[in-house]
Each structure stands twice: as C-alpha cells, then as structure tokens.
C-alpha cells in the first residue's frame, strides 16, 4: 500500500494576525469589485477567497451575457423601467434599491472590466452583420434584440482581468483561505464588525484579520436545497462551492436578515429535476431561443405573450406587438414575463 504525502506544509500550529482598513470576504465578482472600489479610495484592503480568485465564484469559468446594462448606448429602456419590472416580476417582494443600482450602474461596471482587460466587444468582427450585433459600437445583445439591455460578452476573460487589477492596486489577496467566523466589538452598547477569522485550506494556518470595515460577499446558499442523499451534487445550476457559510457566519455574529420568509418555485432544485451546473440544456437563460424537442422528438412551440406561436428563431428575440420589452435571465423565477 502506497502512502500519500500531502503536498503542502503543516502550519496547524501557526497563527498570523493581519490588519487593514477594509476586509472583503469572498473573491467572486462582487468581492473583487468591492476590493477594487476600496483600494481606489486609498484604503488598505485584504481579500479572502477559499478558492483561487482568478477563477473563483459564479463568474470563474466565464459567462456569456451581462444583464441590466440599461445605460449602454444602444439601450431603449431606462434603469427605472427595468428595475421596477424586476420587482413586479417578484410580486413586489424584492429589493428595489439593489435592482435600481444594478440597472443604473451595470454598464459602468462593464466598462470598468473592459478597462481592466476583459473582452466586451466583438473587436475581431467575428459576428459582423449578425442580427444581435451593433456594428458601430461592436456591442452584442441577448434576449430582447429590440431594447438591447442585455449584452453578450466574453466572460471567461473577466475574473483574470479583475485579479490583475486587484494586484495592480495593491490589494492583499489570501487565496485558498476559508473565512470561518466574523469578529465583533461593542461600541456605545452596539455590536460592530471588527474583522474575521480564517484558515488556509491547504496548510491549516490560522488567520486573525482585524479591519475597520468588513464586506461580506460570500454568495448565497445553493447546495442546501436538494434533500435527496442520492443527488447531493445536483444543487441547481450554481457553483457547488456556494454552501451558505457567509450566511451562517453572519447569523452567528448577529447580522439582521431580510426576506428570509420568501420562497420561489424550485425550478432548478426540485428533487429529480436538478442537473449538474450547465450540464443539460434549458431555455431559462444561456440557451434561450434554441429550438427544443420533447421525449418523443416533437418540437416544443414557443409562444409570445398573447399565445401566438413564434415559428422562427428570430421572432423569439423580439417583444410581441404592443409589448414594450420582456425580461429574461435576470430574476429568480426565470419565466418569460411580459410588460
């Protein structure tokens, strides 16, 4: 029997204390932007990521579309219109403030990514003349080809570009380091954040991270919804590393949660209906408008808001007569809703 040698040194008996102005927990897309924003303002920043920041999180492997870019030069809708539509789609039970910020600043953040080295436009004219491309700006669009507020992008270039910008700005990145608990302190009788504890997942080294401000960007629980021991890996279509540890840490530290009583239809996590992340086709977002067949091989018809069959692929990308726009891919229940 061959003995396996752990390739990393044993640092279980080592504790290191670090201090900073801003501590960011989670190195996904949101965490990288938070760290960059703080560093741009002259703050000392530490970012903690349990994986490798250059490829971690939901955006790590890349994605093909950027939603809510309502201020791009080709858009015919306003941030207010789309933000209100997102809230209405959830029957009013959603965070309208966050949605408005998303719609008002989404394109600005995409321009930031482009300046960092991410590929946003069809600069090589690979899709020149395509129905979903604006030949003047070289921007490309998904879903609603009339209103043009969702962009097709080269998402595989984004996380590496963000990682390089973090290093350029002097952010201290602790990769392969799992945050385990939030630190708090009492000020004038009220609890305030004071940093976090973390552990190197390879060496066991323990960190005490002291910070004036702590930003929690550790995604949402995804792997906890499928209550079937035979299908533990089928956690909907989000990263299986999104296990809700940030929520657990926040709860233990006394953070207030909102809308926890809300529930939505389990389209991706209902027992027997889940699949490995993007392991099967669906028309909910990335594969939208692709022609589908049922188990018999019979084509499944697309219909518009009024029930009219859309017989060509092109028709599926435009609002129905009298319909201003439609949403796709930007809300929890990704049904095709019509305004």
Task: Give the ranges of each region predicted by the language model.
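Short hydrophobic core segments
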Residues: 23-25, 210-219
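An anion/pyrophosphate-binding glycine-rich loop and adjacent beta-alpha core
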Residues: 249, 255-337
């Amino acid at each position: 029997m061959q003995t396996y040698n752990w390739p990393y040194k044993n640092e279980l008996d080592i504790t290191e204390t670090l201090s900073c102005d801003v501590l960011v927990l989670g190195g996904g897309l949101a965490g990288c932007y938070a760290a960059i924003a703080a560093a741009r303002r002259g703050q000392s920043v530490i970012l903690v990521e349990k994986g490798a920041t250059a490829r971690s999180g939901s955006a790590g492997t890349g994605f093909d579309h950027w939603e809510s870019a309502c201020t791009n030069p080709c858009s015919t809708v306003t941030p207010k219109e789309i933000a209100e539509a997102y809230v209405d789609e959830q029957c009013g039970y959603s965070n309208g403030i966050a949605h408005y910020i998303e719609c008002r600043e989404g394109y600005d953040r995409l321009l930031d990514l482009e300046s960092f080295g991410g590929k946003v436009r069809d600069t090589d004219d690979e899709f020149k003349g395509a129905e979903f491309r604006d030949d003047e700006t070289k921007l490309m669009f998904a879903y609603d080809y009339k209103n043009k507020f969702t962009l097709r992008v080269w998402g595989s270039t984004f996380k590496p570009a963000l990682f390089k910008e973090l290093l350029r700005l002097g952010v201290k990145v602790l990769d392969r380091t799992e945050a385990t608990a939030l630190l708090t302190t009492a000020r004038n009788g009220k609890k305030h954040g004071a940093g976090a504890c973390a552990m190197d997942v390879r060496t066991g080294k323990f960190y005490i991270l002291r910070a004036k401000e702590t930003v929690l960007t550790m995604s949402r629980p995804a792997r906890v919804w499928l209550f079937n021991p035979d299908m533990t890996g089928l956690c909907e279509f989000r990263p299986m590393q999104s296990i809700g540890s940030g929520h657990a840490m926040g709860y233990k530290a006394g953070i207030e949660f909102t809308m926890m009583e809300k529930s939505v239809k389990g389209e991706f996590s209902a027992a027997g209906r889940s699949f490995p992340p993007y392991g099967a086709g669906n028309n909910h977002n990335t594969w939208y408008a692709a022609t589908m067949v049922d188990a018999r091989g019979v084509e499944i018809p697309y219909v518009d808001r009024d029930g009219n069959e859309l017989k060509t692929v092109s028709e599926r990308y435009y609002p129905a007569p009298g319909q201003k726009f439609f949403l796709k891919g930007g809300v929890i229940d990704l049904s095709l809703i019509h305004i």
